[in-house]
A protein has these predicted regions:
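Active-site region of glycoside hydrolase catalytic domains
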Residues: 1-177
Length: 177
């Protein structure tokens, strides 16, 4: 593995996953995220009691929203230092060869991603109680699929079925969903 890609993946995980999961499941922000934000003068102002509130504010049930995977690689070009600070300063999007796509929205369809999320929660966050709060497939101009007064949405049935298969796999491996 390319070390620069591994670093980009780590930063994306910090920004898009751990910045939300760690406070509500561990009671603190990841130290490496805090250091990164501080080094770019992006750390929000906090009061001394904020740390206590975060530590005590753990949740009982986690809602998971999953539509598509986020795949990243190291940046191919330098960042414009005059541009606003964004997570994308640290990585570029990566397009997996042979990926399955939702042609109506341009999103990758990767049903095993729901399983990956559950395994991460089980192995790295103490297997919290969770549920899938959002998952689905957006399609533009669905009226074009109307046949005899009914929408032929086999594409959506297949999407949900594939995701439920991977959800079931996670549950069968003792994920608490």
């Amino acid at each position: 593995q390319n070390p620069a890609d591994v670093k980009a993946t780590h930063v994306a995980d910090l920004m898009f996953n751990r910045s939300f999961l760690d406070p509500v499941l561990r009671g603190e922000y990841p130290a490496d995220l805090v250091a990164l934000l501080k080094s770019y003068d992006q750390l929000p102002a906090c009061k001394p009691e904020d740390g206590f509130l975060i530590a005590e504010g753990k949740i009982d049930l986690l809602g998971i929203n999953y539509y598509q995977p986020r795949r990243v690689k190291c940046r191919d070009s330098a960042v414009n230092p005059q541009s606003p600070f964004m997570p994308e300063w640290f990585f570029d999007s990566y397009e997996m060869p042979g990926r399955k796509m939702n042609p109506y929205r341009g999103w990758e369809i990767y049903a095993p991603g729901i399983y990956d999320i559950l395994i991460n929660l089980r192995d790295n966050y103490g297997n919290p109680r969770c549920f899938i709060s959002e998952n689905g497939m957006g399609v533009e101009n669905e009226q074009r699929f109307i046949e005899n007064g009914q929408i032929n949405d086999q594409y959506r049935i297949d999407f949900i079925s594939e995701h439920l298969t991977w959800l079931h796999k996670g549950i069968s491996e003792e994920c608490n969903c």
